[in-house]
Amino acid sequence: MSEKTIKVTLVKSVIGTKQSHRATVRGLGLRRTNHCVELQDTPEIRGMVNKVSYLLKCEG
């Protein structure tokens, strides 16, 4: 059985954002602009993505 995943890409820089938002982006495993990661689709990850959605592009 395959786990559901979501593909998250950082499309805007974290410069000038709140410290907590920068920490959330790092917690998602994103390091630089246009960096993409695949993450498990869990409520915790969805909450983190929702918090910094203005910086991200999400697929899946």
From Swiss-Prot:
Q: Which CDD domains match?
A: Ribosomal_L30
InterPro entries referenced in this protein's UniProt entry, alphabetically:
Ribo_uL30_ferredoxin-like_sf, Ribosomal_uL30_bac-type, Ribosomal_uL30_ferredoxin-like
| One Pfam family, short name | Ribosomal_L30
UniProt keywords, alphabetically = Ribonucleoprotein, Ribosomal protein
Give GO cellular component annotations, separated by semicolons: cytosolic large ribosomal subunit
The alphabetized list of GO BP terms reads: translation
Gene Ontology terms, MF aspect: structural constituent of ribosome
Q: Does the keyword field hold Protease?
A: no
Highest taxon of the lineage: Bacteria
Q: Which family does it belong to?
A: Belongs to the universal ribosomal protein uL30 family.
Alphabetical list of PANTHER family matching this protein: LARGE RIBOSOMAL SUBUNIT PROTEIN UL30M, MITOCHONDRIAL RIBOSOMAL PROTEIN L30
Subunit info?
Part of the 50S ribosomal subunit.
NCBIfam families given for it? rpmD_bact
What is the name of this protein? Large ribosomal subunit protein uL30
* Species name: Aromatoleum aromaticum (strain DSM 19018 / LMG 30748 / EbN1) (Azoarcus sp. (strain EbN1))
